[in-house]
C-alpha cells in the first residue's frame, strides 16, 4: 500500500534523533590551538565576508586634554576641570556665583619676602599681603570673600614646581588643589548655586571630570612634553563653537544618484553594549584542581533610543591572542592548582560585532568610506573564589584593561534563517591598575584581565560612538539591494514552495484514475517514492534524513506520539484494575471525549460535534492497524508520487516541506467507518454521521455510545466510497450485497473494476478526492 511511506517516516524518526546527535557532537568538539595574532588576526567565530577594509581615522570622540585656550571670561560647564598655566605672577583666575562666593587665585613667584601687592579682583583694586619663601616652587593662594563688600581671607595654598593649578565645579562644590607637589591633592569649597562665572587671566586647558586622576598627574608632574614646545599656540575659546559642514550624526544623505542606483551616506550614533563570557572547568579528583578558565564568545541583545527611535541591537564579543597562565601549589592531590587560565594583555585583541535593525544595516552590501569613532572603555575584573573541600578558599581578584578602537571592517554572519550584515570593531588593549592576584598564593602583582570574572558583576559594558559609511542602493526605495532578495534561506524556500504549490494543484487534472489506483496498491518506500526527482540519487541518504527530520514535527507525527502515550496510560490503567473493564479510559486514547460519552444527558456538545472529534482520531487508529482495503493515505501518497514525477520545479531542499504538507493537507474531508456484523457506522471530519444496514443500505439511528465503544475494538476503514455515494450507486445501477460489502471495505479490486467499466458515480467520487489533494 502506498501509505507505507507515511508509516516508514513515523517509525524511522529515530534516525533523525541520531543525525541531530551526531551534528551536536561535531559542533561541540573542540581542539586546543595556539594562536599567533598578526596584524590581521581575526576570530573564527562565524563566517565573514570582508568589505573594503578599515579606514584610518585619528579623531577621538572627546579629547582628554583640550587646549590651550587664550584668557577669557566665560561660564564653563560643570563636570570639567579648568587647568591653568600662568607664565607671570599675578591674578590667575577669578570664580564667583554672584551670591555668596568670590574666589580669586593669585600666583607668587619664588623668593618673595612678606610684602603688600596691589591686585584688581572682580573689577575692584585690592591690597593683599603675600610671601613665598621657597626658592624653586611657585605659590598659588586662594583668597575668598562671602559678600560684595566683604574683605578677602586667605584659604587654600598650593606649592607647585610645575606652575599649574586647576579649578572645577562638581555638584554643589568648587574644587581646587592644595599641599605641595608632587603630593598635591584636592580640596573644595561649598558652591551651592548653579551660576558659575570664571575669568581666566592665563592660558588654560579643559579636562573632563572623568579624567580626575590625569588632572592630578598633570598638577604634580607637569604637562606632556608636546604641550611645552613653541609649535603649540593658544587659540580663542570660540574655536570650540565653529560650525562645520560635516554631516551630523543620524542622517541619510544622497551623495549621488542615477536612474537605477544612488549612493547614500549613513551617519549613525551607536551605543555598544557587550559582555565577556567564560568557561570555568574543574578537574576530577578530590576537588582541589581546576583544568581551565577561558574566555568564550558572548552574544548580547538589547534596545536603546537613538533620536527618539527605539533601536534593537545585537553584539557578539570575542577575544584573540590570549595569554595562558598556570599555577601549581604543590604535587599533592590536596594542593590547589590551575592547569590553564587565560589573561588579556597588551598583545591581545577584542572583537565586537555590532548589528542593529536600522536602515543602514539593511543596505550594508556595497560599501565605501567606512569610518568609526568610539570612546575608550576600561574593563575591570572582579573576584572569583575557588571553593575547596577543606581549608580557606583562594580567590582570583583584580585586573583591568582599557579597550581602544583600532579599526572597523564589514562582516557578514550567516545562519540557517538570516544573514546579518554587521560591523566588526577591533580593539587594542592596554593594561591598567589594579593588577590581579590569587589570594593565599604567591601569585600577585600581575597585570591584565583574567577570565575568572571579567564582567565584575556587571550585566554589560557600554561605550558610545558613531560610524559613517556610503552605501550603493537602488534609486527606488521600494526595491532593495539585490542580495537582500535572498536575505534568508527560509524566504527563498517559501518563494519556491509557493511556485511549487501552484504547479502541484494544476497537475491534479492530469492524473489518470486507473494509474492512481494501481500506484496506490504499490508498497512505496522512501527511495522508490522519490526516485523520479532529479539530483536525489546522489544525496539519497541526506535527502531521506531531511524528509524525516521535517516530517517528525508534522501534525500527523505529533498526533501519533501523543496517541501512543495515551494508549500506554490507558493500558496501565486497565492492568491495574483487573476486575473492572474500563472502556472509557481506553477509548479516551482514541476519542478525547470519554467524559462526554460517559454521560450524554449532561453533554454540552451535539452528537455531530462528538463524532467529528472522534473521526479526527480515526485516521491514527487506521494507520496503526492497517487493513486489506485501500485508505485515504494510499490515495494521497499515490497522488503525491504522480505529482513529484510530473513536477519540473521539485528540488531536494523543497521535498521535506512538500511531503510534510501533503501528509497534513491532502484530502481534508475524510469519512471513516466501522462494521459490526450487519451494521455500519460512518463518521466524517465535517461532522456528518450515518448508521445503516450493510445488506439493504437502510439508514438506522446513530448510537454514539456504541460507536465510541466500537472504536477501541474494531478495525477502522477509510470510507473511500462514502454512504452518500453508495446509496446513489444502488439507486441508479443496483449493486449486489457482495459488491456493497466490498465497497464498504474499500476493496481495491472492486474499485478498479468500476473505474475500468467507466462508472460515472465511482469515477466522480475518486476525482473529488484527487481535487482535495492540494497544497
Curated annotation (Swiss-Prot):
<keyword id="KW-0472">Membrane</keyword>
<feature type="short sequence motif" description="YGL motif; interaction with ITGA4">
    <location>
        <begin position="447"/>
        <end position="449"/>
    </location>
</feature>
<keyword id="KW-0946">Virion</keyword>
<keyword id="KW-1015">Disulfide bond</keyword>
<dbReference type="InterPro" id="IPR035329">
    <property type="entry name" value="VP4_helical"/>
</dbReference>
<dbReference type="InterPro" id="IPR042546">
    <property type="entry name" value="Rota_A_VP4"/>
</dbReference>
<dbReference type="InterPro" id="IPR035330">
    <property type="entry name" value="Rota_VP4_MID"/>
</dbReference>
<keyword id="KW-0175">Coiled coil</keyword>
<feature type="site" description="Cleavage">
    <location>
        <begin position="230"/>
        <end position="231"/>
    </location>
</feature>
<dbReference type="GO" id="GO:0044163">
    <property type="term" value="C:host cytoskeleton"/>
</dbReference>
<feature type="coiled-coil region">
    <location>
        <begin position="483"/>
        <end position="510"/>
    </location>
</feature>
<keyword id="KW-1043">Host membrane</keyword>
<dbReference type="InterPro" id="IPR000416">
    <property type="entry name" value="VP4_concanavalin-like"/>
</dbReference>
<dbReference type="InterPro" id="IPR013320">
    <property type="entry name" value="ConA-like_dom_sf"/>
</dbReference>
<dbReference type="GO" id="GO:0039624">
    <property type="term" value="C:viral outer capsid"/>
</dbReference>
<dbReference type="GO" id="GO:0016020">
    <property type="term" value="C:membrane"/>
</dbReference>
<dbReference type="GO" id="GO:0044168">
    <property type="term" value="C:host cell rough endoplasmic reticulum"/>
</dbReference>
<dbReference type="Pfam" id="PF17478">
    <property type="entry name" value="VP4_helical"/>
</dbReference>
<feature type="region of interest" description="Spike body and stalk (antigen domain)">
    <location>
        <begin position="247"/>
        <end position="478"/>
    </location>
</feature>
<keyword id="KW-1035">Host cytoplasm</keyword>
<keyword id="KW-1032">Host cell membrane</keyword>
<feature type="site" description="Cleavage">
    <location>
        <begin position="240"/>
        <end position="241"/>
    </location>
</feature>
<keyword id="KW-1160">Virus entry into host cell</keyword>
<dbReference type="GO" id="GO:0044172">
    <property type="term" value="C:host cell endoplasmic reticulum-Golgi intermediate compartment"/>
</dbReference>
<keyword id="KW-0167">Capsid protein</keyword>
<feature type="region of interest" description="Spike foot">
    <location>
        <begin position="509"/>
        <end position="775"/>
    </location>
</feature>
<keyword id="KW-0945">Host-virus interaction</keyword>
<feature type="site" description="Cleavage; associated with enhancement of infectivity">
    <location>
        <begin position="246"/>
        <end position="247"/>
    </location>
</feature>
<keyword id="KW-1161">Viral attachment to host cell</keyword>
<feature type="disulfide bond">
    <location>
        <begin position="202"/>
        <end position="215"/>
    </location>
</feature>
<dbReference type="GO" id="GO:0020002">
    <property type="term" value="C:host cell plasma membrane"/>
</dbReference>
<keyword id="KW-1038">Host endoplasmic reticulum</keyword>
<keyword id="KW-0348">Hemagglutinin</keyword>
<dbReference type="GO" id="GO:0039665">
    <property type="term" value="P:permeabilization of host organelle membrane involved in viral entry into host cell"/>
</dbReference>
<dbReference type="Pfam" id="PF17477">
    <property type="entry name" value="Rota_VP4_MID"/>
</dbReference>
<protein>
    <recommendedName>
        <fullName>Outer capsid protein VP4</fullName>
    </recommendedName>
</protein>
<keyword id="KW-1162">Viral penetration into host cytoplasm</keyword>
<dbReference type="GO" id="GO:0019062">
    <property type="term" value="P:virion attachment to host cell"/>
</dbReference>
<feature type="region of interest" description="Hydrophobic; possible role in virus entry into host cell">
    <location>
        <begin position="388"/>
        <end position="408"/>
    </location>
</feature>
<dbReference type="InterPro" id="IPR038017">
    <property type="entry name" value="Rota_VP4_MID_sf"/>
</dbReference>
<keyword id="KW-1037">Host cytoskeleton</keyword>
<feature type="region of interest" description="Spike head">
    <location>
        <begin position="65"/>
        <end position="223"/>
    </location>
</feature>
Amino acid at each position: 500500500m502506498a501509505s507505507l511511506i507515511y508509516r516508514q517516516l513515523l517509525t524511522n524518526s529515530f534516525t533523525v534523533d541520531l543525525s541531530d546527535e551526531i551534528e551536536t557532537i561535531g559542533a561541540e568538539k573542540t581542539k586546543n590551538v595556539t594562536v599567533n595574532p598578526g596584524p590581521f588576526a581575526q576570530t573564527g567565530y562565524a563566517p565573514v565576508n570582508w568589505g573594503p577594509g578599515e579606514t584610518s581615522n585619528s579623531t577621538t570622540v572627546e579629547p582628554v586634554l583640550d587646549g590651550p585656550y587664550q584668557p577669557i571670561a566665560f561660564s564653563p560647564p560643570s563636570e570639567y576641570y579648568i587647568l591653568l598655566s600662568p607664565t607671570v605672577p599675578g591674578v590667575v583666575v577669578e570664580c564667583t556665583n554672584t551670591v555668596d562666593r568670590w574666589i580669586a587665585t593669585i600666583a607668587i613667584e619664588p623668593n618673595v619676602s612678606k610684602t603688600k601687592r596691589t591686585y584688581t579682583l572682580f573689577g575692584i583694586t585690592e591690597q593683599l599681603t603675600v610671601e613665598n619663601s621657597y626658592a624653586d616652587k611657585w605659590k598659588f593662594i586662594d583668597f575668598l570673600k562671602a559678600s560684595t563688600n566683604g574683605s578677602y581671607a586667605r584659604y587654600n595654598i598650593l606649592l607647585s614646581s610645575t606652575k599649574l593649578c586647576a579649578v572645577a565645579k562638581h555638584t554643589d562644590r568648587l574644587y581646587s588643589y592644595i599641599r605641595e607637589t608632587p603630593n598635591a591633592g584636592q580640596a573644595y569649597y561649598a558652591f551651592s548655586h548653579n551660576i558659575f562665572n570664571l575669568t581666566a587671566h592665563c592660558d588654560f586647558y579643559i579636562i573632563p571630570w572623568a579624567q580626575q586622576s590625569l588632572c592630578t598627574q598633570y598638577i604634580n608632574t607637569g604637562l606632556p612634553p608636546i604641550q611645552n614646545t613653541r609649535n603649540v599656540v593658544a587659540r580663542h575659546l570660540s574655536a570650540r563653537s565653529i560650525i562645520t559642514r560635516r554631516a551630523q550624526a543620524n542622517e541619510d544623505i544622497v551623495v549621488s544618484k542615477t536612474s537605477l542606483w544612488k549612493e547614500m551616506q549613513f551617519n549613525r550614533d551607536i551605543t555598544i553594549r557587550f559582555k565577556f563570557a567564560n568557561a570555568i572547568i574543574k578537574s576530577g579528583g578530590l576537588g582541589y584542581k581546576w583544568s581551565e578558565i577561558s574566555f568564550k564568545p558572548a552574544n548580547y541583545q538589547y534596545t536603546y533610543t537613538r533620536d527618539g527611535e527605539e533601536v534593537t541591537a545585537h553584539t557578539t564579543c570575542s577575544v584573540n591572542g590570549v595569554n595562558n597562565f598556570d599555577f601549581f601549589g604543590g604535587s599533592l592531590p590536596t594542593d590547589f592548582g590551575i592547569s590553564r587560565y587565560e589573561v588579556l594583555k597588551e598583545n591581545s585583541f577584542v572583537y565586537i560585532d555590532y548589528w542593529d535593525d536600522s536602515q543602514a544595516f539593511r543596505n550594508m552590501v556595497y560599501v565605501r568610506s567606512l569610518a568609526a569613532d568610539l570612546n575608550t572603555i576600561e574593563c575591570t575584573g572582579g573576584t572569583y573564589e575557588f571553593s575547596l573541600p577543606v581549608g580557606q578558599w583562594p580567590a582570583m581578584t583584580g585586573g583591568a584593561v582599557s579597550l581602544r578602537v583600532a579599526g572597523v571592517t564589514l562582516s557578514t554572519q550567516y545562519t540557517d534563517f538570516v544573514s546579518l550584515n554587521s560591523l566588526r570593531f577591533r580593539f587594542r588593549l592596554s593594561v591598567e591598575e589594579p593588577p590581579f592576584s590569587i589570594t593565599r598564593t604567591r601569585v600577585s602583582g600581575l597585570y591584565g584581565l583574567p577570565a575568572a570574572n571579567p564582567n565584575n558583576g556587571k550585566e554589560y559594558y557600554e561605550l558610545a560612538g558613531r560610524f559613517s559609511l556610503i552605501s550603493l542602493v537602488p534609486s527606488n526605495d521600494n526595491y532593495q539591494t539585490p542580495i537582500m532578495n535572498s536575505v534568508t534561506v527560509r524566504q527563498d524556500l517559501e518563494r519556491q514552495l509557493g511556485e511549487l504549490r501552484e504547479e502541484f494543484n494544476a497537475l491534479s487534472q492530469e492524473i489518470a484514475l486507473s494509474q492512481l489506483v494501481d500506484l496506490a496498491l504499490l508498497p512505496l518506500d522512501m527511495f522508490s517514492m522519490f526516485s523520479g526527482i532529479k539530483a536525489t540519487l546522489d544525496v539519497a541518504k541526506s535527502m531521506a534524513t531531511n524528509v524525516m527530520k521535517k516530517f517528525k514535527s508534522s501534525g500527523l507525527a505529533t498526533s501519533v506520539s501523543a496517541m501512543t502515550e495515551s494508549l500506554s496510560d490507558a493500558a496501565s490503567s486497565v492492568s491495574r484494575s483487573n476486575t473492572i473493564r474500563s472502556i472509557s479510559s481506553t477509548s479516551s486514547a482514541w476519542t478525547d471525549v470519554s467524559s462526554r460519552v460517559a454521560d450524554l444527558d449532561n453533554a454540552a456538545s451535539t452528537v455531530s460535534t462528538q463524532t467529528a472529534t472522534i473521526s479526527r482520531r480515526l485516521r491514527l487508529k487506521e494507520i496503526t492497524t492497517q487493513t486489506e482495503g485501500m485508505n485515504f493515505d494510499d490515495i494521497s501518497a499515490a497522488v503525491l508520487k504522480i505529482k513529484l514525477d510530473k513536477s519540473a520545479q521539485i528540488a531536494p531542499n523543497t521535498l521535506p516541506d512538500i511531503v510534510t504538507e501533503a501528509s497534513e493537507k491532502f484530502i481534508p474531508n475524510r469519512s471513516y467507518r466501522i462494521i459490526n456484523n450487519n451494521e455500519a457506522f460512518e463518521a466524517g471530519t465535517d461532522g456528518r454521521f450515518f448508521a445503516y444496514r450493510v445488506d439493504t443500505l437502510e439508514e438506522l439511528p446513530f448510537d454514539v455510545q456504541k460507536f465510541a465503544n466500537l472504536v477501541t475494538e474494531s478495525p477502522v476503514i477509510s470510507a473511500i466510497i462514502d454512504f452518500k455515494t453508495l446509496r446513489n450507486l444502488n439507486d441508479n445501477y443496483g449493486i449486489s450485497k457482495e459488491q456493497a460489502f466490498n465497497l464498504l471495505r474499500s476493496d481495491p479490486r472492486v474499485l478498479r473494476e468500476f473505474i475500468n467499466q467507466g462508472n460515472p458515480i465511482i469515477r466522480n467520487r475518486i476525482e473529488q478526492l484527487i481535487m482535495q489533494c492540494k497544497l
